[in-house]
Structure formats: structure tokens, C-alpha cells
Amino acid sequence: MNQLELYIDTFVEYLQIEKNASPYTVKYYRNDLEIFADFLRSEGLSHIANVTYKDVRIFLTSLYEQELSRRSVSRKISTLRSFYRFLEREGYVEGNPFVQLHLPKTSKPVPGFLYQEELDKLFEVNDITTPLGQRDQALLEMLYGTGIRVSECQNLRLQDIDFAIGTIFVRGKGRKERYVPFGSFAEIALETYLQEGRTKLLEKSNSDTEFIFLNSRGGHLTNRGIRTILNKIVERASLTVHVHPHKLRHTFATHLLNEGADLRSVQELLGHESLSSTQIYTHVTKDHLREAYMKSHPRANGNKS
């Protein structure tokens, strides 16, 4: 293992232990760092401490030559800026050549969301007379009804649900914890699943578990398992739009804001540290926008002469 690989491994370990980064974040960081390592080797740069601002500019040019999007380039530069900041703090290098690098601002894409008719189709296709159908319905109700992330939903435990006041305890990103309310539809789906479906699924496993959502063998349902379940639900509903679990979170936020919820409350429900992360959801549906226009503009409904 050469020195750069050792630095990368040390940084990744820091992300996992100190920053509690998700496996997906770690994967993307490592990938970005390995791309930079390949560049250094191709340029004959043997020591990371010798990298200059000029080298960084050449690296940036090489990224654009690959026709990567601005967003992808910005993420890679952000990764390397953090990497060098870590190395500088640990005393491995004396400066951060990426500090001087300024990139054009990238606009955040508007998150996709589902219309009510599309949501209704998803909720109608699960066979709630079967254990798996009851689980799928409860899973769907939790993802849309609370807006929690897939990883947060996967890690829900029995003791995290308080049916008396209709809330769940959520362990969020970066060890941040919060309480999120759920409504009557989610309550009914959860109670049915816990009393019937989950009990039957658990019988297939030799061990007990406190996790709420189980796979077909009675074990803990994985993130990939949740995505597979949702794909099957979408297929049964014959939806033509792509639906990933995070789109249900986008839909949750969009529908709340469209119906008058304030931004700060939605921020708290989503577990966003920064309000700017929540502001990307302030788009509205075309129908909602037209309805507001027709109700509010003085010349929207005038008679034509």
C-alpha cells in the first residue's frame, strides 16, 4: 500500500467512525478519491503534499473533458477539498490547493414527486389479506406518511412507535434523532401488519428481532429489499413514472407545503439541518399553481368581450 492509499483509507475510516457517514456517502467519497489518485499517477505526482493549485486546475480540466455534469464535478472537488482539509488538520500536508478553486454554482434539480392519483394507485395494489401485502402496505404508508428516509425506515424498532400519540422515534443521519407524527392511514396499516403479518413472518425465523420491517424469511429487511418491494408495487400499479423510495419523501414534503405547512415545520419533520435543504421542495404542482392563480388574480376569471 502506497502513501496515498494509506491517506485515503485513514480518511475513509474518519468518515465512518467520526462523521458516522452512510455507506453510500463513503462509497462516493472513495470513488472520487480514487479518480484523483489515478490522475496523480498519470501526471507523475508521487507525493500528495507536492500537489499545487496548477495541478488542481489541470485535474479540473480533465474532469470537464470527460463531459461530466457540473454537479458531478462540484461533488468531486468538494470531496477533495474535505480530504485535504483532513490531511492538513492531521499534519500530513501544509496547505489545501483546493481552497483557491472556485466552481460555478450549480442549480439544485427540482425533486420529482407523485401526484395524488399516482399515489392512490400504489396504495390500491397490495393484497392486505396476506402477510407480505400487509407489510408492503405498512411500509408504503410509513415512507409517504412520515417522509422518513429508507435507512431510517429500515432501522425502525418496535419500541420506536407510540400509538398513543401517533409518533415514531427516528434515528437520522449523523446520529441526529427526532420524533415524527403519523396519521390514521399509517396507524391502521401498521397495527394490521404488527398484529397479523409480522407475527406470521416472524414464525419463519428461529430468532426474535425488534426491527419492525421483516423480509419473507422473517429476518431484518434491508435497504435493497425495500427498493425491490417498491419496484414491485410500482409494476403492479402500472405506473409509467420511475418511483424510488426517496421520491415518496419528496412527495411528502411537496404535498405538505402545497397544503400550507410552513417551511420550518417541514424542515423539522424531514430532519434537515439546514433550511436551504428544505427550500428545494417549495415548487408546487401545475394544478395547485393554476388554482392559486385563478383564485387570486383579479383578471383571471373576467368575461371576454
Swiss-Prot record:
The active site is at R149, K173, H246, R249, H272, Y281 (o-(3'-phospho-dna)-tyrosine intermediate). Residues 2-88 form the Core-binding (CB) domain. One of its GO terms (cellular component) is cytoplasm. Residues 109-294 form the Tyr recombinase domain. Pfam families: Phage_int_SAM_1 (PF02899), Phage_integrase (PF00589). Keywords: Cell cycle, Cell division, Chromosome partition, Cytoplasm, DNA integration, DNA recombination, DNA-binding. InterPro entries: CB (IPR044068), DNA_brk_join_enz (IPR011010), Integrase-like_cat_sf (IPR013762), Integrase_catalytic (IPR002104), Integrase_recombinase_N (IPR010998), Integrase_SAM-like_N (IPR004107), Recomb_XerC (IPR011931), Tyrosine_recombinase_XerC/XerD (IPR023009). It is found in: Cytoplasm. One of its GO terms (molecular function) is DNA binding. Its main location: cytoplasm. The keyword Cell division applies. GO terms for biological process: cell division; chromosome segregation; DNA transposition. The keyword Cell cycle applies. Belongs to the 'phage' integrase family. XerC subfamily. Site-specific tyrosine recombinase, which acts by catalyzing the cutting and rejoining of the recombining DNA molecules. The XerC-XerD complex is essential to convert dimers of the bacterial chromosome into monomers to permit their segregation at cell division. It also contributes to the segregational stability of plasmids. NCBIfam families: PRK00283.1 (NF001399), recomb_XerA_Arch (NF040815), recomb_XerC (TIGR02224). Forms a cyclic heterotetrameric complex composed of two molecules of XerC and two molecules of XerD. This is Tyrosine recombinase XerC. It comes from Oceanobacillus iheyensis (strain DSM 14371 / CIP 107618 / JCM 11309 / KCTC 3954 / HTE831).
